[in-house]
Structures are given as structure tokens and as C-alpha cells.
Amino acid sequence: MARITTEDCTGKISNHFDLTLVAARRARQLENGNTPLVDDARNNKPTVTALREIAAGHIGTELLTRNK
């Protein structure tokens, strides 16, 4: 699978600071056992899976306003 970069995600979340916060929070959720929203996530680290979810449009800035 191709590498994912933050540039792949800026179409969904244009603010780099928000992108970092969303990716970190989602990676923490994945690390704590939440189910990944993309296929083939088991071979990736939680941070990579979080970025893939953002790039696919499954996760956005609404994660920052929801309760943990």
C-alpha cells in the first residue's frame, strides 16, 4: 500500500493544527481498541490508520467537538 502523508489529508482538513489534533485523538482511540474504519488497518500503526481514515473522509474535525 502506498505511503500516506499529511498532504493527502489536507483536502479534508485544511488546518494543519486541527489535522494533527484529529489524527492524534483518533490514533489514541484506535490504540485503546476502537474499530478501524478502513480496510487492511491491522498491518499499520494507529497513526497511519488514523491518517488513512481522514484521507478517506471517515473522520473529520467533528472528532474534536465530540466527547471522548
Swiss-Prot record:
Enzyme category, top tier: transferase
InterPro entries: DNA-dir_RNA_pol_omega, Pol_omega/Rpo6/RPB6, RPB6/omega-like_sf
Gene Ontology CC annotations of this record: DNA-directed RNA polymerase complex
Keywords linked to the UniProt accession: DNA-directed RNA polymerase, Nucleotidyltransferase, Transcription, Transferase
Reaction(s) the record says it catalyses: RNA(n) + a ribonucleoside 5'-triphosphate = RNA(n+1) + diphosphate
Signal sequence residues: none
E.C. no: 2.7.7.6
GO MF entries: DNA binding; DNA-directed RNA polymerase activity
The keyword Phosphoprotein is annotated on this UniProt entry: no
Subunit structure: The RNAP catalytic core consists of 2 alpha, 1 beta, 1 beta' and 1 omega subunit. When a sigma factor is associated with the core the holoenzyme is formed, which can initiate transcription.
PANTHER family associated with the record: DNA-DIRECTED RNA POLYMERASE SUBUNIT OMEGA
Family: Belongs to the RNA polymerase subunit omega family.
Protein name, per record: DNA-directed RNA polymerase subunit omega
